[in-house]
Amino acid sequence: MDGRQHSEDARKLIHILFGGCAFLLRYLAWHEAALVAIGALAFNLAIMPRVGAAIYRPADRTRRYLHGIVLYPVAVLGLILLFPYRLDIAAAAWGILALGDGMASIVGRRWGRRRIPWNRDKSIAGSVALFLCGGAAGAFLAWWCRPAVIPPPFLWFSLGVPFVAALVAAFAETIPVRLDDNILVPGSAAAVLWVFSLMSEDLIRSFVMDAGMQVLIAAAVNGTAAWIGFRLRTVTTAGAVAGAVIGTTIAAATSWNGWMLLLMTFLVASISSRLGVHRKTLLGIAEERGGQRGAGNAVANTGLAAVAALMAVLTNSRDAAMVAFAAALAAAGSDTIASEIGKAWGRRTYLITNLQAVRPGTSGAISLEGTAAGFVGALLLGAAAVALSVIPSSALFPVVAGATLGAFVESLLGATLEARGILNNDLLNFINTAVAATTAVLLMGTA
């Protein structure tokens, strides 16, 4: 074993061992647990650079602070502050980060010859290790901290859901961006755990028993629609499969009214992508694959809507979930309209951070024409949601406001983080829908 691999293993061993502190969450109040995370952060900032320099990578030894040793305790602190009364969720996500991400690195270096097709820096063996080891650690810690939650969560949640969270985290880790794994892995895992924590066991049982025929019909319709989309070259093969799964989920959970809103969003995105193709091609900013939508695009733009649709039938917050569903789709559709209209017919394009003129298609660029078109698109999709009885008329303003804010946040992050490779377009699209859904639900709560 050479010195470089030895230091890598030493770093990951420390990474894994820090996860042992998660066992304390069974006995600590949230503010006490937060102090532990703050203490770890202070140690990593003040002491680790002096005593642990030998295990640093050569390129890191000239830096005062390393992202990893700072972001790890920051992520743990964030988990504790976000889930002060569900420390089992914080512990499970912490375990997935500690053992899952740690073993992914160790296994990937030793046996990771087969690489992930869309990210050659990641290996299949490493992703499998993250899923298995992270899922096991998350499940054990969720079970261990179960007595600290009042009332205790269902046993199926503690022992089963962490594996689902680890699977999502393993996929998220393969996304080709520079967003640190210490944020991406626990963040995605905690989001999955939180969604499942809101679900009612009785509603799950009722949905499983009653939705069988609806699921079959939805699968047949969406499979056919996906095949037609593939034949018309509006989606790739992977995009067709992802779209069929998402469409089936939405149709089964929200009835055909919700599915019609999804279809309208897809049609709007596909049509707007084909507007002004000649100018976009000349400028070198035409959509890849001739505007065909891939799996990443489908999940980024409509994945959150599918989750909201499931929450509408599996939680006791149906009204809020349906508002989130409509806002996510309105944001996805209006964002595509704004982007494509801006690139096709925008006369002047400005960077949102400093309003300097930039070329159309620049990350974070906005135009008057695109912004206006996006607002109109959000309004039309929101009105369609009202007409389809997906949301009440009182939710129209929150949905449009959420979609508009989501678009501006996406542009801001595009100008700052996408340009540096920390985020990519698919992650920006997902953040856009998340901001829209969250904003709409919060506005409905204050109405």
Specify the residue positions occupied by each region the protein language model found.
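Hydrophobic alpha-helical transmembrane segments
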Residues: M1-W118, S127-A338, G342-A447
